[in-house]
Amino acid sequence: MNGDILTSLADGIDLSLNQFLAKKSLNEARVARILDKAINIELDEDDPSQSGCATGLPAGHYNGSAGAFFARGKKVVQISSTVIIPCARRCSQNKQLNMSVDLMTINHIGQKVVVSVSLDELARNPELVIADLVSKGFGVTTFVHSRGYLERFIHACMKMALPMYLVAESMGMVEGEAAFLHGDMPLARGISGFDYLVPHKSAFSGIRPSGSLAGWKTVIKDNAHGWPQLFALSSSLASTLLGMAGMDVALFHFYGGSTTGKTVVLQVGMSVHAHGGEPGSHPDVAILRWNTTDNALELSLSEFSGLVACIDELGAYNDRKFSSLLYNITSGRAKIRLDKSLRRRKPVLWKMNILSSGEMSIPEKLASYNEQLQGGQEHRAISLNILPEDAAKEGESVEEVRRRADTLKAELAEQYGTAGKAFIARFLSQQNDDGSLMSYSELSEQIKDTTTVCCQMLAKELQSDGYVLSDIQHRALKRFALCLAAGGMAAEWDILPFEPQMIKDSVMSAVRRWLDDGLNQYNPVKEALSAIQLELIKRQAAHFVPLQDKEAYIPSNHWGYTHPKTQDLMIFAPVFDDWCRRHNRKSAEVAKLLSAKNYLEPESKGHYKKRVQNSDVEGVFYQIKRSFLHCNISAEF
């Protein structure tokens, strides 16, 4: 996809995005013309300064048919047997990191080649840098003497007034700039102090677009149907705006039986930005799998930061550390690891929406390890139950639904990666009332305001339907609202082939499906019970004494007594009250649930505290049955 195609993707894309996109190719074309001229110059190898081509080179360097030379006075050193011209400099936004120089040559078989030489790598491992240049066809010599002059040449190039490329650590929006890196394609109107935008490392090949936006829209319009697929499209687009909207990572997990089309939902969502083919069918397919190591999955997520990530088959993940992995995934940061020298490695980070699939929900997966969804994760890890009928049109048979799904699977391996680019290009082309292009801060405020309006709209409709949302559910609703905002804009801009009302209906269906799934909602009482259970298991021996043992040592932090016959735990009411208070729960609420599950012995119906019938002991207790220590809270409550 080139700059001319960019503005033809959708109406309203500003011409400045075309112009920025063309800068690198125009610059390299300019350098190529210098190379073509230099390679035809016959220079005197004993005195290259007399006839050699110095255009585009640092002082004292010359190109000619015999290659690249350094010459100063009587000192003449051949740096390369092929001509070399520096194209551009690269560095990070603070102009202190990721410094490198792009060098162009005409290699031994006549092909023009550009290689970026990292100053850091040159200092750490010059032999590896030279080997890479040689492998690409640069005629650089491996002699130690000449190598020193090559290093000086590269450092001299870094001081030249060459075009400056901004190195982005990851894809996505550039902080403070109306610029976005999508794969290796910059979508920008301009960047202060820089001429172009490049990735820190080569983007995954499946992110490069295939087909056309018109072709993709036809496939989606004819074959995509139902709220899960439309919601996947909206959340995939919303993922690109997380930073501007002031939000962090969200995981939308689609779960259901084996014939509900979960994987197709991921394919539809991924096709917005990258190869949406069947997982495992081609090396370029961008859908990840849960069946991998934590480290590998975290690294893969970082490679899709700024776009969207899709992970298939949660059931294939079999490590008992799922709770820890889920925490890392939704926090956007990998576990801190050390390198061979015991120094901290550079943190692996990501920020995007993650679409996931599996036959069980996130809470069910946690429950299989006797864990449960924590309060801080409910608004980040959202399980959405999908049913076979969700993808069916009215009156459509099962065979017809399957046929459309098969068509999607096949076509999305050919048509992908254009809608996301068109959406961002159109987003960056928005104008103020006076016709001026919106700045980064104005775009950020606009998407925040739009998301707030969408959130209020969703909340009002839910309230009219009788839903009462908790604070955590309100936070999750903002994530759905961003999906509505992004999907609505894409529909209005004719990037999604659906009416805005269809987008709204799909988001509202997703919200209702989530709220109606009571078993998979965060339960603060269950969290309090888990904490109490863990506290009792770990520390009961140090804080409880037998009820009838008059000679037993009484600990300073005394929690209560053990029943002489049943070994039940008779917990002092103030101790139990304090545990519940730490989790913002009332003691009666927790005790009632324990009693209902037959894990608490009440004094009488509705009265959960008991007084010990022992003249030597005073106080009020909650009698927790011994069996509570071994129950599966996630499954039983």
Where are the language model's segments positioned?
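Phosphate-sensing "switch" segment of ASCE/P-loop ATPases
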Residues: V348, N370-A490
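P-loop NTPase catalytic core of nucleic-acid-dependent motor ATPases
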Residues: G190-S281, F480
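DNA transaction DNA-binding modules
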Residues: M164-N223, D434-F637
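Conserved glycine-centered beta->alpha loop in an early N-terminal alpha/beta scaffold
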Residues: N2-A224, L299-S300, F304-L307, A367, ...
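AAA+/P-loop NTPase substrate/partner-engagement loops
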Residues: V265-C310, L314-R320
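Loop/turn-to-beta-strand initiation segments
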Residues: S305-V308, W350-I354
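Structural recognition of the conserved hydrophobic beta-strand(s) that form the central parallel beta-sheet
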Residues: K351-E359, S383-L384
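Conserved Walker
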Residues: R333-L349, K365-E371
